[in-house]
Amino acid sequence: MASVLYITYDGLTDPIGQSQILPYLLGSAEAGHRLTVISFEKPQRLALAGDQVRAQFAEHGIAWLPQQFRSSPPYLAKAIDMVAMRRAAAGAVRNHKFDLIHARSYQAAVTGLALKRKAGAKLLFDMRGFWPDQRREGGRWRSRSLLGSQLYRRWKAHEARLIAGSDHIVALTQAARQEMLTWPSYRGAPISVIPCCADFDLFALPSAEARRVVRQRLELQDDTPILGYLGSIGTVYRLAPHFALLRRLRDSSGAKGLFVCRESESEILDEARKLGTPLSPDDIRVVRAERAEVPSWLGAVDVATCFITPTFSSLGVSPTKLGEYWACGVPVYANAGIGDVAQLIGEVDGGQLLPDLGDASVDLAAAQFATLAARDPTALRDRARARLDLGRAIDAYARIYDDWQQPVSLVAA
């Protein structure tokens, strides 16, 4: 079994760490691998959930070296964090012999690449998408900004070195893998494809009674059509076509929109007005839920959306919410040009793929709502579980730890 140094700039006490990192670490430890974990924790989150993570790690024999995540001073804080990451990793390498450095995303991989020779370990670059291009396309590193341009060029150079120097690469999509195979920096390292998977034990299919109870809490009738949206409002997911679709469904069938997100009702309504698709408070229901509560709210939803702007970086996007919707038996509207979404929707028969996000596509989606809502949720869940169950991803990482020279793929090429 492998001895692994796992480095992530995300926090294990944050929602993403709880859902997308912690289960994999615990599963790998249960498979017999020995892990030392470096993560960056926000002080308030560490105070709330740190003891829970420590207890889980102690039970599984995982060593944890949490570091403080800094948010100020701007820009300088990130540099300080990177120095702290390098120091923590160097200290771990001095004290332990590792077979593998598992670096989650670019910042961690830069540290891993710098230390792999000293550690005598192989580097697993778990890239999580084309991060520099996501930052530029999302408006964080604008091309017209001197600082933005410098940061983009620096991290694209880091990216090339990471692709060239890693011993194993994990991508979220086959689309990203096929793209990397064409890069001059690619030197033949095995590339595994492990999409964002869902915890099908947590995201369970609701009973008819549970669905009725949740709708009562929302003050909605059992037969009211509900269009769902899961996740915070950000730069990746497109709200304009979602609002436009909701308005059409409202006008044709009295549908309501359910938003399970961090934003308030007023923020959702303000965003709808800004996008030229105004809604009234009666058109929507907005709930803020902890992760364990999300499945019960999804139990009220008939069909949900997963609309993302297609760009270069979207080749590497694997929406976590896709598997979570399907685990709850909820079919999905999605648009073409996003990672392996088109392939997965076809294999799972999990909803409707729109060619684009224009008005004609939104009209087509509205016309198909009743048909999608009538699909058998149990059959949908079963088909999706065979492809996107969390256990399959945990097993895939364990197989890489067992033999880093062999690629693993959960999505067919």
Predicted feature residues:
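A short helix/loop element that forms part of the nucleotide-sugar donor recognition site in Leloir-type
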Residues: 49-56, 204-220, 377-378
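Nucleotide-sugar-dependent
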Residues: 15, 237, 287-297, 304-326, ...
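N-terminal subdomain of nucleotide-sugar transferases
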Residues: 1-59, 244-252, 402, 408, ...
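Conserved donor-binding/catalytic core segment of Leloir-type glycosyltransferases
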Residues: 5, 221-237, 242-246
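A charged, aromatic-enriched C-terminal amphipathic alpha-helix characteristic of glycosyltransferases
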Residues: 356-364, 370-403
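Membrane-proximal helix-turn-helix segments that form the acceptor-binding/catalytic region
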Residues: 87-91, 110, 114-118, 131-133, ...
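Nucleotide-activated donor-binding/catalytic signature segment of Leloir-type glycosyltransferases, i.e.
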Residues: 261, 267-298, 303
